[in-house]
Curated annotation (Swiss-Prot):
Subcellular location: Cytoplasm
Subunit structure: Heterooligomer composed of large and small subunits.
Enzymatic reactions: Exonucleolytic cleavage in either 5'- to 3'- or 3'- to 5'-direction to yield nucleoside 5'-phosphates
Cellular component terms per the entry's GO annotation: cytoplasm; exodeoxyribonuclease VII complex
One family name in Pfam for this protein: Exonuc_VII_L
Organism: Lactobacillus delbrueckii subsp. bulgaricus (strain ATCC 11842 / DSM 20081 / BCRC 10696 / JCM 1002 / NBRC 13953 / NCIMB 11778 / NCTC 12712 / WDCM 00102 / Lb 14)
Chain's gene name: xseA
Protein name in the entry: Exodeoxyribonuclease 7 large subunit
EC annotation from Swiss-Prot or TrEMBL: 3.1.11.6
Major location (coarse): cytoplasm
Enzyme class: hydrolase
Length: 456
């Protein structure tokens, strides 16, 4: 009381009294660390600030302050009416002369606290899509290497290796040992998965798990950092945590959940004898299908060999051969006309020469005659060459128009179900059966869609 000074020896100011009471509270060793339980009341979350609420039981209530730095460490979302454990100190607020509890930590009360943390984290991660079905990846059919994260001393790794070797001995099993229980288990599990992630290209699938236990024993597999690491793995993950009735957040984030380690190994590996039997069945079906295709193609080839075109191919050339004969006859007649015309000209020149008789004229006419003779010869030769070229072109066209040669160049022609040649899309409707004639056989198909193209 030495520091208390009032305007009168007998009277204290309000501030002096509140200060004195605060000193009493702050110096009391029993009030410096108090473990308190109660029900949250008047709780309204203040984002980014200090939290002010009350704790109550059936008979009493106390005001509580939790500063931002301490509240940020709380691992669950407090809700109105929730029973909690808090630790802190008791002191007064001088400005109002009231005492209140200053909370340093808070957690849900009892075993229900873990269930509440589980529920809240499950809801949070589900909203982020970590458990969404569209993110689940299929397991590889034939894994070369399988990574396993579990205890090195438990029965889990033994069951996995025995089952995998029995079903698919080709697969290599690599153990990444980790603690699966206790306060440091979550960090150990994450560290093991990060080692696998660094070598992700080596492993086809990951199995993570442990044997059965209580909720507290299995809790590391519900920690947020473990669940997020499972979701982030680059290879498919099989989770096998606890018994079949146990469900952890790790199970929900994994691509597949197995009830037991043995079931996890069965998911990760194929049953080799069954696979070999299925391959044998597929081989038999494939051979049957191949034989059927060969038989159909052989029948088509036989039909082609017995067709009109193959038996009498010369009939394809008959009309073209007649055209060649006609062109040859026309060429001969033209040659006769040209020769006759030039002969008449020569006769006229000769007659004129006989009438004129002078040597100079005769010489000139001889030169003209020589020139005309050469011109005639060159003209005849040129006409012959042109007609011969036309004849060769006609023969070549005749050969080009051969259906066999057209088919040999990769073309085909199409007939409908009645055997009529299809020349326009207007002859067809979707669903019609058509036959494609190729150089080495026929193919039967069905019209799916018709697209008409207009040529300008």
């Amino acid at each position: 009381m030495d520091s208390i000074k009032g305007t009168d020896e007998k009277y204290l100011t309000v501030s002096e009294l509140n200060w004195y009471v605060k000193q009493k509270f702050d110096r009391d060793p029993y009030l410096r660390q108090i473990f308190l339980q109660g029900e949250l009341s008047n709780f309204r979350f203040r984002r980014g600030g200090h939290q002010y609420f009350s704790l109550k039981d059936d008979k009493s209530k106390i005001n509580v302050v939790m500063f931002r730095g301490d509240f940020d460490k709380v691992k669950f979302e407090p809700e109105e009416g929730m029973k909690v454990y808090v630790t802190g100190r008791l002191s007064t607020y001088e400005a109002q002369g009231s005492y209140q509890f200053y909370a340093k930590s808070m957690e849900p009360a009892g075993l229900g606290a873990l269930y509440e943390r589980f529920r809240q984290l499950q809801e949070k991660l589900a909203k982020e899509g970590l458990f969404a079905q569209e993110h689940k990846r299929p397991l590889p059919l034939f894994p070369d290497k399988i990574a396993v994260v579990t205890s090195a001393s438990g029965a889990v790794i033994h069951d996995i290796m025995v089952t995998a070797n029995r079903r698919f001995s080709h697969a290599e099993i690599d153990l990444f040992p980790a603690q699966v229980q206790g306060e440091s288990a979550a960090g150990s599990l994450v560290s093991a998965m990060q080692q696998i992630q660094a070598r992700a290209d080596e492993y086809d699938v990951l199995i993570i798990g442990r044997g059965g236990g209580s909720l507290e024993d299995l809790w590391p597999f519900n920690e947020e950092e473990v669940v997020r690491q499972v979701y982030a793995m680059k290879m498919p993950v099989i989770s096998s945590v606890g018994h079949e009735t146990d469900t952890t957040l790790c199970d929900l984030a994994a691509d597949c959940r197995a009830a037991t380690p043995t079931a996890a190994a069965e998911m990760a590996t194929p049953a080799l004898p069954l696979v070999l039997a299925e391959i044998g069945q597929l081989q038999t079906r494939l051979l049957t299908d191949i034989r059927a295709v060969i038989q159909v193609r052989a029948q088509a080839l036989a039909q082609l060999e017995n067709s009109f075109i193959m038996k009498e191919p010369q009939r394809l050339y008959e009309q073209k051969m007649q055209q060649v004969d006609q062109l040859s006859q026309q060429l001969s007649r033209m040659m006769e006309v040209i020769v006759k015309d030039q002969g008449q000209k020569l006769s006229l020149l000769t007659q004129r020469l006989q009438h004129q008789a002078p040597d100079r004229r005769i010489k000139q006419l001889k030169q003209e005659n020589s020139y005309l003779a050469k011109s005639l010869e060159m003209g005849i030769k040129r006409i012959l060459e042109q007609k011969q070229a036309a004849c060769r072109q006609a023969v070549q066209q005749l050969d080009d128009y051969s259906p066999l040669k057209t088919l040999a160049r990769g073309y085909s022609y199409t007939t409908d179900a009645s055997g009529n040649v299809v020349k326009s899309v207007q002859q067809l409707v979707p669903g019609d059966q058509v036959r494609l004639h190729l150089k080495d056989g026929q193919a039967i198909g069905r019209i799916e869609e018709i697209k008409e193209e207009k040529n300008d």
